Amino acid sequence: MKNNASIALAAALTTALTAGPAISHNTFTAMTVPAGYIQDLEMRVTHGCKGSSPVNSVRIKIPEGVTRVSVNVVRDWKVETKMRKLPKPVPGEGGVMITETVDEIMWSAPKSMIPASGSYEGFRFRAHLPN
């Protein structure tokens, strides 16, 4: 059951990322992750396909049940987060109750686009995964 939830999480993140103005080849670095743990996750985005626009923004929708999200800053990209209220508070570090979590992570406006030469950009974040 835990592996199924982990695979579903990876699929949800990948699907959310590819919906955007440019089509690119994306790889989620962790296909299975342990449920109930805090995990470092990365979406690797390559160049836009031939004939499509260059990749100039990346959006990741965080699925329900994922809490305590922190975002890695990608050099030369602007990062923003959109928050959502949790249905009920969950315990965080030091006994502090968490009442909201990141709903979406958006990286945009890079100083230079991802080149089409087989390179990629990694968009990382850390999240507490559901059980």
Predicted regions and their residues:
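Low-complexity, intrinsically disordered segments enriched in Ser/Thr together with acidic residues
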Residues: S108-P130
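A surface/secretory-pathway sequence property marking extracellular, secreted
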Residues: G65-D103
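Beta-strand-rich interaction surfaces with strong enrichment in secreted/lumenal proteins
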Residues: T29-A30, G94-G95, A109-P115
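N-terminal edge beta-strand
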Residues: A22-V45
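Bacterial N-terminal signal peptides
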Residues: A10-A16
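Bacterial N-terminal signal peptides that target proteins for export
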Residues: M1-A8
